[in-house]
Curated annotation (Swiss-Prot):
Biological processes per GO annotation: DNA recombination; DNA repair; SOS response
GO cellular component, one term: cytosol
Major localization class: cytoplasm
Gene designation: recA
PROSITE patterns: RECA_1 (PS00321), RECA_2 (PS50162), RECA_3 (PS50163)
UniProt binding sites for ATP: 78-85
Keywords annotated in UniProt: ATP-binding, Cytoplasm, DNA damage, DNA recombination, DNA repair, DNA-binding, Nucleotide-binding, SOS response
UniProt-listed InterPro entries: AAA+_ATPase (IPR003593), DNA_recomb/repair_RecA (IPR013765), DNA_recomb/repair_RecA_CS (IPR020584), P-loop_NTPase (IPR027417), RecA-like_C (IPR049261), RecA-like_N (IPR049428), RecA_ATP-bd (IPR020588), RecA_C_sf (IPR023400)
The organism of origin for this protein: Leptospira meyeri
High-level lineage: Bacteria, Pseudomonadati, Spirochaetota, Spirochaetia, Leptospirales
Region (Disordered): 350-387
Name this protein carries in UniProt: Protein RecA
Length: 387
């Protein structure tokens, strides 16, 4: 009897609390508009996180969610010529492939349209702005975000967002903390709008050295501390090796460390090749991932798949994947499945034509097998040599 009374009292209290919450929600929506407050499970926009691929499968895996998240701020920083702009242009190309609209705010006034085209960017559809000062750049960014029509915005770079007062002043004038205050104010205004518009905003940043640091890293990024707090993802990209072909540099191998990640576990790393001719090399990343997940076996310099040898040296295997896109597609989907990433659509397989190289007729078959194989891309022909 006592238990029944206690249950009824508890049920009555629960109903009263529910009515009070509903009344409060109704009042908030009446005052601030519909959607100003809601239950998390009922908000599909917050429950499902859309992502934009980085163009590197290894980095997509390291990020834990398959790419850059929509409605968030991302910071990419690193030394000069480490691949920061290339990585963002690759993300723009992936956005355009999905039918999205991208914008590039070129504060450094250094965007090369021909290079962007080589990376797969549709330059005819890419929105580009070259602002005169930092305030103008950030106002352009805010206008694009508020349009709710842009999927990805890249700002290159934070260091080039020079405040108007500094531009109008004389050389040698002191403007202590002016850029940091500009970034802090802009990010306070932008963060909420970016989230509501579901736009991904990527800030490229540069590295500076702090003077007098005795312990720890003396490196820091420009623009103050605000961006470090507001960014959901921070990537540190470094060049670790120069790729050469017949003693000629043809690309860089880079390592990207996920310094901060609000969407998945941080501190993961990814390594991939960036070729000077066509950007991130997907085949090279696929080989590394396939070997790591035991989908492709490696014995010495030989690689084998399904019990059959597919090439000696990485370059031969890259050519094998280019000549057999179906096998590359199958392996990539296996890697994606093992890492809980969405699978690729078979209709989006891109084949690349493999051109033959003129040989000396006196060459034997054995000699031919040791010769470099060339393969073409949309932009130009790269020569691939065996390891």
């Amino acid at each position: 009897m006592k238990k029944e009374k206690a249950d009824k009292a508890q049920e009555k209290e629960t109903d009263q609390r529910k009515q009070a919450i509903d009344a409060a929600l109704g009042q908030i929506e009446k005052q601030f508009g519909k959607g100003s407050i809601m239950r998390l499970g009922a908000d599909t926009r917050m429950a499902e996180m859309n992502v934009v691929s980085t163009g590197s499968l290894d980095l997509d895996i390291a990020l834990g969610i398959g790419g850059f998240p929509s409605g968030r701020i991302v910071e990419i920083y690193g030394p000069e010529s480490s691949g920061k702009t290339t990585l963002t242009l690759s993300a723009i190309a992936e956005t355009q492939k999905k039918g999205g609209i991208a914008a590039f705010i070129d504060a450094e006034h250094a965007l090369d349209p021909s290079y962007a085209k080589k990376l797969g960017v549709n330059v005819d559809d890419l929105l580009v702005a070259q602002p005169d000062n930092g305030e103008e750049a950030l106002e352009i960014c805010e206008s694009l975000v508020r349009s709710n029509a842009i999927d990805l915005i890249v700002i290159d770079s934070v260091a080039a967002l020079v405040p108007k007062a500094e531009i109008e002043g004389d050389m040698g004038d002191s403007h202590m903390g002016l850029q940091a205050r500009l970034m802090s104010q802009a990010l306070r205004k932008l963060t909420g709008t970016i989230s509501k518009s579901n736009t991904t905003v990527i800030f490229i940043n540069q590295i500076r050295m702090k003077i007098g640091v005795m312990f720890g890293s003396p490196e820091t990024t420009t623009g103050g501390n605000a961006l470090k707090f507001y960014a959901s993802i921070r990537l540190d990209i470094r060049r670790i090796e120069t790729l050469k072909e017949k003693e000629e540099p043809v690309g860089n191998r880079v390592r990207v460390k996920v310094v901060k990640n609000k969407c998945a576990p941080p501190f993961r790393q990814a390594e991939f090749d960036i070729m000077y001719a066509n950007g991130i090399n997907r085949e090279s990343s696929l080989i590394d991932l396939a070997v790591r997940h035991d989908l492709v076996a490696k014995a010495g310099s030989w690689y084998s798949y399904g019990g059959e040898k597919i090439g000696q040296g990485k370059e031969q295997v890259k050519n094998f994947f280019l000549e057999n896109p179906d096998i590359a597609f199958k392996i990539e989907n296996q890697v994606r499945d093992l890492n809980s990433l969405p699978l690729m659509d078979q209709s989006k397989i891109q084949t690349r034509e493999v051109k033959s190289i003129e040989r000396d007729p006196k060459e034997t078959k054995e000699t031919k097998s040791k010769q470099p194989v060339s393969f073409s891309t949309e932009a130009e022909v790269d020569i691939a040599v065996g390891e």
